[in-house]
């Protein structure tokens, strides 16, 4: 299967929220596998963002008035269109992001499952709910959920469909509009998803894609939005959080990670070695929840290292637009430089390469072998800093207690993986880890795919959560409507104020003793 045609890019380009697309300066988009130009994308400005917000605000008012079930119907139609167009979407993901096809398919599965989940649960989550009134039988209290308004989304290049539209879907079903800045390396992945949303019946002004540099477009979105969702580095997330704080708007972010795996005695090492190749090297390690540190109890460390090293050396790298390849490319020269730098620094300081360890320009300009290191010391760059590439280090430990201590010895806390002799033991270990998600007998997919449960990070790994009820309700303002029935707190029925005030405390104490009040 080839990369998408020029006609496809011409069609998608016109969906960008930019006036006079043909007259704008452009940025070249390359096919990652070859480094050859695919197409160009117009570069948006702050004025484009402001225009998109003006149109979005006008459209959002009507959208919020539509019944939730109608908004959900749009998302269901979008889900069905993703299923129908999955091969095209995978082609585009491979061309623009350099993924192996199975890694591209992970994104498609997420788009479908995410849309299905929020379309299914949004009516119940957003319906008004009763709350305990001040005085039972005399008052009525209801909690309603109002949309924030226009949500800003700033998305990364590594999962350019999942982390654009899947963060936007709950905002849209909650009654908001969205203005989104895709990463400059992968704008067409965002535009392709937007096209399907428009075809599903979403008014175009409600979902505006503005490509352009973060310093311009990202800043303008942060200046104008009513809520900001960001996925990217911890450093950038910190700056955006400060900006959002000054504006007193809500902010949610999934940020970096240095994710650990613990392998305890009794674990099935053949199974762990196979699963760890996916856990560590999905999307060439360019996955915020992928594993970069493996802690193995000493008496099984040698056997595990041998089995895992063999599995990694057998991985197939390639540029095929089919399922014959195990790992694709890094996305940019910057990523290749970081990965090479971390490995070179480690080996120069005494680390041992068990598998991989070098670039593969014979396959493509940005390919790097999946790499396994041992003898990694704290002073090495890869020991504590996120590589965000196909590099993982193995650390033998005396026991599970030491493994947990070292796994938690980080400022990050996004994802973790545990493998033990039994599910119960794995769950006990998992509960000791300081991490937003922990997978037992799996690397990352089960926690990510549990869409009814929250997903996010602790520490420098993020603020807030996506997925689950939290992933939708964060895009709303809760509104309490309390109604006084019969009488309010003024003296009723002509009772003198002095008598009424003396009666209030006994009344409150009586109410506190009612069922459900203690």
Swiss-Prot record:
NADP(+) binds at residues 157-158, 181-184, 232-233, 255, 386. One of its GO terms (molecular function) is succinate-semialdehyde dehydrogenase (NADP+) activity. InterPro entries: Ald_DH/histidinol_DH, Ald_DH_C, Ald_DH_CS_GLU, Ald_DH_N, Aldehyde_DH_dom. PROSITE patterns: ALDEHYDE_DEHYDR_GLU (PS00687). Disulfide bonds: none annotated. It catalyses: succinate semialdehyde + NADP(+) + H2O = succinate + NADPH + 2 H(+). Pfam families: Aldedh (PF00171). One of its GO terms (cellular component) is plasma membrane. CDD domains: ALDH_SSADH2_GabD2. It comes from the Bacteria. Keywords: NADP, Oxidoreductase. Belongs to the aldehyde dehydrogenase family. Catalyzes the NADP(+)-dependent oxidation of succinate semialdehyde to succinate. Although it has succinate semialdehyde dehydrogenase activity, is likely to act physiologically on a different aldehyde(s). NAD(+) can substitute for NADP(+), but enzymatic activity is three times reduced. NCBIfam families: PRK09407.1. This is Putative succinate-semialdehyde dehydrogenase [NADP(+)] 2. The lineage of its organism: Bacteria, Bacillati, Actinomycetota, Actinomycetes, Mycobacteriales. The gene is gabD2.
